[in-house]
Each structure stands twice: as structure tokens, then as C-alpha cells.
């Protein structure tokens, strides 16, 4: 065995290790245990070649995939697809271009080969097409049950989609956009004549279908309804007063203070007819003709009601309100729809405003008792 020079490895080993290399007692202890003793020279440490080396570990196939040898075996066992005409032509052409341009990258060579193949005419491609057909027939004979299996399987990405029926708690998704509720829909229809909102109101605990959907909501939860519209649509909002009392409680919001005061003091029939058709009885800005208002006695009709004053004396006016008033908080009588205010068109209501206010207060009390019983039940 060839020995290393005396100064080999002296600078690599720490001083403590060099001092312990020739310490006495190590060989004696080894002889007492029956182990072979190697003579270590104090001047020449053990060479790295004399140390035992463990064999190289191959990566585990189950944990790290195939090793180098196993990968080669798998590639040899895998049946390759037959080459097409371009592959047959590019097999030799790639070698020629690589020898001419050794500095070019393989991707650049592939682009050059693709351009050169497209520039060839049919006569120049024919021999390669025939060779590719021969290889295909030979491959079919050698492997009759061959089925192409790509190496990498394309994994379809799973896109999580939120189903339209699933909504977060506290959120209401209207089935129609807010534009469907605007005044430009074609006619002044009431809320119940608009397209239905689907099953969004099923969980709001509505007691009866006759009630307005807004009654089951809190004042702050009606945000999905359209915002205040243009001034020309104020008449339509006043017509829908029982379904949106917060918009039509004060007529000055739409018409201004002078006109609102005139509406409060004017006879009931004329302003209500004006509210139905538009401001001051003029037709609204709708392209389609409006349906006529409910039949009601005009100012001349009040004179015809005088002979029937004895009939109105036996009628309880609050009985009509508990069926016709559909809101919890009853708005002013000037903003009620035509058929609701019509129940109070009598000689007493028109002649005695104090009695009318008393009847209105009694009507509010009866309505509160009626709807509190409905909600609690």
C-alpha cells in the first residue's frame, strides 16, 4: 500500500484529533477485547483511502419515485408511439442543425425545424410520409393491442361554484334587478301586480298573503327596493303609500311644502284622483295608457250621498279600516290609496274634522290590536 506524504491532511485535522491519534492505551484496549489492531504511525495519519466506505444508497422507489436504473427499465418497457412524417424528417435534420449551430438551444432548433418543414412542398415530404406509414403498419403488427397512454394525466381543475339557491344568512337576493321596479315599466301598477320575487319571502314569517311583504321586514332591511326616483315619479310613490310608508309619509318630500299643504286641506276626491294620474290630475310620463282609477264619487257625488246619511249613521267606519289598512303604522289619510280613503268619505267625515280625527285614532287602535294578535298567533 502506498503511503501518503508526511504533511498530508495535517492542516485539515484539528489539533485535538492529531494529539489523540497516537495516544497509548487504545491498542491495548483493543487487544483485550479481541479486536484487530492497526498500527498507526504517529508521524503519518491514516489516509482517506484506507477508511471503509459505505456503498451508495439508491433512492427508494416507493418514496422518491423510480431510481435511475428503475427509470431506464420503465422507459424500455414502455411502448413508444410510431413516428409521423415530421418526426422522421426531423430526426436527421436536427442532428445536422445541431452540428452546424452547437450554441443554439434545443427550443430554438425546434422552431427552425418547424419553419423548415412548413416550407417543404408535397413532393419533398412524400418520402417521409411513406416512411411514417410503413412504421405505423409495422407498429400495428408488433403491438396489435396497443393503446396510447400519456405519461402525465391531465387533472381537471375543480371549480367551486356557489349554487344560486344558497345565500348567506341575512342576505336577500332579488330575482329581478331594481330596474324592474322603476316607473318606466309601462304602467302604474301596484306592488302586488309587479313580478313576484320568488321564494325569498318564505322565511320572513308572513301571516297571510293579503299583507304586504314589507310588513315582515324591519325598517332597515328594505334596502333591496329601488332608491328614491325622479320627481316625476312622486305620484307613483304616493300611490304605493301603504307598502312603503317611509317614502310617502310626508307629501312635501315629493311636491314641496306649499303643494303638500294644499293636498292636506283639499277635498279628498280630487287630490287622490290627481295622485293616481300624476301631479294635479295630469297624466304621468308613462308611454302606455294608465288603467282607470277605481270608481269613486266625485264632488257632485257627495251631494247624492246626503239622502243616505241615515245609512252611514249605523255603519262602523273602523270596520272598513281593519280590512283595508294593510300596514302596521298607518300613514296620513291624505296619502292613502283611493279605495282606503273612500271608506271615510261620508257626511260626518267631510263636515266634522274633529270627529274624523277621533275616528282615525280609533281606527289606529283597532288596527294595532288586530295585527298584534296576528303576529303573536
Swiss-Prot record:
Q: Among the record's GO biological process terms, what is one?
A: lymphatic endothelial cell differentiation
Keywords of this entry: Activator, DNA-binding, Nucleus, Transcription, Transcription regulation
Q: Which disease is reported for it?
A: Defects in this protein are the cause of the ragged, ragged-like and opossum phenotypes. In all these, missense mutations give rise to a truncated protein that retains DNA-binding ability, but lacks regions required for transcription activation. Homozygous ragged and ragged-like mice are almost completely naked, display prenatal edema and frequently die in utero or shortly after birth. Heterozygous ragged and ragged-like mice are mostly viable, but have a thin, ragged coat. Homozygous opossum mice display no visible phenotype up to 11.5 dpc.
Give residue spans, biased composition: Low complexity.
Answer: 21-34, 41-52
Annotated gene:
Sox18
- Cystine bridges: which residues? none
| Extra facts | Deletion of the DNA-binding and the C-terminal transcription activation domains causes no visible phenotype, excepting slightly darker coat pigmentation and a decreased proportion of auchene and zigzag hairs. The mild phenotype is due to functional redundancy with other Sox genes. The phenotype apparently depends on the genetic context: backcrossing the mutant into a pure C57BL/6 background leads to defective lymphangiogenesis and the same embryonic lethality as observed for opossum mutants.
Name the UniProt record assigns to this protein: Transcription factor SOX-18
Amino acid at each position: 500500500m502506498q503511503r501518503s506524504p508526511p504533511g498530508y491532511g495535517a492542516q485539515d485535522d484539528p489539533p485535538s484529533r492529531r494529539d489523540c491519534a497516537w495516544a497509548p492505551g487504545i491498542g491495548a484496549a483493543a487487544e483485550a477485547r479481541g479486536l484487530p489492531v492497526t498500527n498507526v504511525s504517529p508521524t503519518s495519519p491514516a489516509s482517506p483511502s484506507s477508511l471503509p466506505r459505505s456503498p451508495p444508497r439508491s433512492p427508494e422507489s416507493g418514496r422518491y419515485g423510480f431510481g435511475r436504473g428503475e427509470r431506464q427499465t420503465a422507459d424500455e418497457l414502455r411502448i413508444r408511439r410510431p413516428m409521423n412524417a415530421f418526426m422522421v424528417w426531423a430526426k436527421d435534420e436536427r442532428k445536422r442543425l445541431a452540428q452546424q449551430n452547437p450554441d443554439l438551444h434545443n427550443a430554438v432548433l425546434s422552431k427552425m425545424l418547424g419553419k423548415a418543414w412548413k416550407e417543404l412542398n408535397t413532393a419533398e415530404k412524400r418520402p417521409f410520409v411513406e416512411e411514417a406509414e410503413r412504421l405505423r403498419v409495422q407498429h400495428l403488427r408488433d403491438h396489435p393491442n396497443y393503446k396510447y397512454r400519456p405519461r402525465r394525466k391531465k387533472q381537471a381543475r375543480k371549480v367551486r361554484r356557489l349554487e344560486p339557491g344558497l345565500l348567506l344568512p341575512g342576505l336577500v337576493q332579488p330575482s329581478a334587478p331594481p330596474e324592474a321596479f322603476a316607473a318606466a315599466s309601462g304602467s302604474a301598477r301596484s306592488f302586488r301586480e309587479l313580478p313576484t320575487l320568488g321564494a325569498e319571502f318564505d322565511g320572513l314569517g308572513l301571516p297571510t298573503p293579503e299583507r304586504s311583504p314589507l310588513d315582515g321586514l324591519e325598517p332597515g332591511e328594505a334596502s333591496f327596493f329601488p332608491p328614491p326616483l325622479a320627481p316625476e315619479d312622486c305620484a307613483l310613490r304616493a300611490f304605493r303609500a301603504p307598502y312603503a310608508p317611509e317614502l310617502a309619509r310626508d307629501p312635501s318630500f315629493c311636491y314641496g311644502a306649499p303643494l303638500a299643504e294644499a293636498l292636506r286641506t283639499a277635498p279628498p276626491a280630487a287630490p287622490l284622483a290627481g295622485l293616481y294620474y300624476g301631479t294635479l290630475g295630469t297624466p304621468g310620463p308613462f308611454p302606455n295608457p294608465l288603467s282607470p282609477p277605481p270608481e269613486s264619487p266625485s264632488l257632485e257625488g257627495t251631494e247624492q250621498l246626503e239622502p243616505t246619511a241615515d245609512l252611514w249613521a249605523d255603519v262602523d267606519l273602523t270596520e272598513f279600516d281593519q280590512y283595508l289598512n294593510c300596514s302596521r303604522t298607518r300613514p296620513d289619510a291624505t296619502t292613502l290609496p283611493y279605495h282606503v280613503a273612500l271608506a271615510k268619505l261620508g257626511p260626518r267625515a267631510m263636515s266634522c274634522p274633529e270627529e274624523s280625527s277621533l275616528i282615525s285614532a280609533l281606527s289606529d287602535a283597532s288596527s294595532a290590536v288586530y295585527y298584534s294578535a296576528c303576529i303573536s298567533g
